[in-house]
């Protein structure tokens, strides 16, 4: 039996402030670091020993992975970083408060921007300092591939080739892998693995730093999936993510 653990990064500073983050490179909060450490401790207790790890170019995911591996005494394993696992690009919404944006545009519209399959926010202008074409970390990515905004459909289009050609290919010769990324890049992967419809994907909300295990047979057919943690606690965490656009 082969396993891949999907893990959304720990709480970031903009998660705490309830802002749209996207490709903005914000750090973890103290709570986020603690969440990552807890995830590592759980994975170690469950006996996981990863052969390789994957993460995005964004520090909230990179630092989460580093913390997890440190707690597991697996700092030495090979880690591969890729922009293709970055969060969905939220265009001009990046930096805005979700609840305040819902007050301005309506909760239904914000929910479509956050969770729908094929609706993207307005793109950031070419000369906007937030444009990834101005970021040195993407210097080896062609401008045509760098987004100014994305829907979940767009995010899947850049994530899935990497998932199929790199991660699943690696699983053929590995037993256990871990992928630490972001809510929407991981939602796209889960949509593929569980064959979730375009309509139903809107209802999937991933909590921060809760390990999500996928088991595969030797032919790489997915056989089982489950969160590590108390089911009621995981449910509450998922509901909290769903309610982020509501005024408190």
From Swiss-Prot:
Keywords assigned: Gluconeogenesis, Glycolysis, Isomerase
UniProt entry tagged with the keyword Isomerase: yes
Molecular-function annotations in GO: phosphoglycerate mutase activity
Biological processes annotated in GO: gluconeogenesis; glycolytic process
Annotated site (Transition state stabilizer): 182
Residues the entry annotates as binding substrate: 8-15, 21-22, 60, 87-90, 98, 114-115, 183-184
Catalyzed reactions per annotation: (2R)-2-phosphoglycerate = (2R)-3-phosphoglycerate
Signal sequence extent: none
Coiled coil (residue ranges): none
Enzyme nomenclature, EC number: 5.4.2.11
A Pfam family per the record: His_Phos_1
Superkingdom, taxonomy of origin: Bacteria
Active-site residue numbers: 9 (tele-phosphohistidine intermediate), 87 (proton donor/acceptor)
Pathway this chain belongs to: Carbohydrate degradation; glycolysis; pyruvate from D-glyceraldehyde 3-phosphate: step 3/5
Family under the similarity heading: Belongs to the phosphoglycerate mutase family. BPG-dependent PGAM subfamily.
Role of this protein: Catalyzes the interconversion of 2-phosphoglycerate and 3-phosphoglycerate.
NCBIfam families (UniProt xref): pgm_1, PRK14115.1
Protein name according to UniProt: 2,3-bisphosphoglycerate-dependent phosphoglycerate mutase
């Amino acid at each position: 039996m082969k396993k891949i653990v999907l893990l959304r990064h720990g709480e970031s500073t903009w998660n705490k402030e309830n802002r749209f983050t996207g490709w903005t490179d914000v750090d973890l909060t103290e709570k986020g670091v603690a969440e990552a450490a807890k995830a590592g401790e759980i994975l170690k207790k469950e006996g996981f020993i990863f052969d390789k790890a994957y993460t995005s170019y964004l520090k909230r995911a990179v630092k989460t992975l580093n913390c997890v591996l440190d707690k597991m005494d697996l700092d030495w394993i090979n880690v591969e970083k890729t922009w293709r696992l970055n969060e969905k690009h939220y265009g001009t919404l990046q930096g805005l408060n979700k609840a305040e944006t819902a007050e301005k545009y309506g909760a239904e519209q914000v929910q479509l921007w956050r969770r729908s399959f094929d609706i993207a926010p307005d793109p950031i202008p070419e000369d906007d300092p937030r444009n990834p074409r101005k970021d040195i970390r993407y210097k080896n990515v062609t401008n045509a591939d760098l987004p100014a905004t994305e829907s979940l459909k767009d995010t899947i289009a850049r994530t899935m080739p990497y998932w199929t050609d790199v991660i699943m290919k690696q699983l053929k010769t590995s037993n256990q892998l871990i992928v630490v990324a972001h809510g929407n890049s991981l939602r796209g992967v889960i949509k593929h693995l569980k064959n979730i419809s375009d309509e139903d994907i809107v209802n999937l909300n991933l909590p921060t730093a809760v390990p999500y295990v996928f088991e595969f047979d030797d032919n790489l057919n997915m056989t089982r999936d489950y969160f590590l943690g108390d089911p009621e606690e995981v449910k509450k965490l998922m509901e909290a993510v769903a309610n982020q656009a509501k005024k408190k």
